[in-house]
Amino acid sequence: MEYVSGGELFDYIVKNGKLQEHEARRFFQQIISGVDYCHRHMIVHRDLKPENLLLDHNMHVKIADFGLSNMMLDGEFLRTSCGSPNYAAPEVISGKLYAGPEVDIWSCGVILYALLCGTLPFDDEHVPTLFRKIKTGIFPIPEYLNKQVVNLVCQMLQVDPLKRANIEEIKKHEWFQVDLPSYLFPSNIEQDSNVIDTYAVQEVCDKFGVKDTEVHNALLSEDPHDQLAIAYHLIIDNQRFADEAAKAEINNFFVAGSPPPKL
């Protein structure tokens, strides 16, 4: 288990109120990077909120509390109404079927609003009234928010899940793209399926107490839900993520260390 010393993003918002746009964007980019990672590995969180987003000593966001998360299966839908009411999507509180990613997108939209405004878009002490507000999808838009971010928030807080922005649309949005660190979305380099990383295999063996032949068999089975195969690919992804982050740090170092231009 990892110790995260910076506390909850919720406490940070309570202490600081609405954040400067550049800081809100930096947090939001990291949140979307983490949610995208979960969704690519067929996991839907279902309880995203600032209380479940932790900050490390470098003020990097860590997604926590997967107690209500679920695995997504092709062609199957979820119905369970779960999560915190203020961050729950209309289809969740209405007991409708949902695929999964779209409810996390709604929650991320609420979080983005909270980062920028210091308040929630939908709030009421009376739960039935709160639910009515969520189902209408109508919320106040402060005048100080720029048009780009208002456009993004509105796309994410679409009542109709079919019209709601998806991860790819968020990643391509002009507001989201500003100062976006490349390591948050490392390039998806296709690997030769015949080449197996022996380091990653050994790490899986150490963590699960299995033999390397079992890991090889899991990879050859091509079962997307095999825990050994999932662990292997997580290790590969984490290594690629770390490599991209290291490259970004080196680039930033050389840029910062460049001599000033001659006058």
Which sequence ranges carry the predicted segments?
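C-terminal regulatory tails of eukaryotic serine/threonine kinases
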Residues: 162, 168-259
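A short, hydrophobic secondary-structure junction motif
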Residues: 111, 259-260
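Eukaryotic serine/threonine protein kinase catalytic domain
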Residues: 1-180
